[in-house]
């Protein structure tokens, strides 16, 4: 019995290496989990411009769900982070206005969409509170598997109306913006 107890005591002895491993292991696991979450589940961004005022302010830090469109398609009015079609090294944040197969036209600042069923609707603009939209643009026929984007601050937004490559492919959408976490926490609608 004494030999068994001595062996058990020796196994439980702390060594400097074991202390370091015991200390570092939870930190390493936490870092790996954080990286996996950032890479596979969430995307975050700092908004550098006023193109989405007043929905998203300059300097706001936002979080998007990378999983939002795995089983569902993006919907009109979703605010998304996506790869800018004219330079995919940059991420942009805009609102989805036109869906695949639709035609988008802006007349006197009002956005009209001709849906795939041929019905033309005037889009709601209750989120466009920062300015009075002006101008005529389009018509733009949205290709299959692509989307037409506009900023909420319509008079100060570099969006689908002005890009060389007017549309964002679904696979280039990084995620659906779900909330702002700085400087205040609030849901993005």
Regions flagged by a language model, labelled:
Residues 49:
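A short acidic/basic microdomain associated with nuclease active sites
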């Amino acid at each position: 019995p004494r030999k068994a107890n001595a062996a058990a005591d020796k196994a439980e002895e702390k060594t400097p290496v074991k202390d370091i491993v015991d200390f570092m292991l939870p930190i390493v696991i936490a870092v790996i989990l954080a990286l996996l979450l950032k890479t596979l589940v969430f995307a975050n961004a700092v908004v550098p411009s006023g193109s989405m005022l007043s929905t998203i302010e300059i300097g706001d830090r936002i979080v998007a769900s990378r999983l939002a469109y795995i089983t569902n398609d993006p919907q009109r009015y979703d605010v998304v982070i996506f790869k800018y079609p004219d330079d995919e090294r940059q991420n942009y944040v805009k609102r989805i206005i036109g869906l695949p197969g639709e035609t988008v036209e802006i007349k006197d600042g009002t956005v009209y969409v001709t849906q795939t069923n041929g019905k033309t609707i005037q889009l709601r603009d209750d989120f466009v509170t920062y300015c009075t939209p002006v101008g005529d643009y389009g018509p733009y026929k949205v290709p299959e598997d692509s989307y037409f984007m506009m900023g909420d601050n319509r008079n100060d937004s570099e969006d689908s109306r002005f890009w060389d490559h007017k549309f964002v492919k679904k696979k280039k959408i990084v995620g659906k913006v779900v909330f702002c976490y700085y400087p205040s926490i609030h849901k993005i609608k």
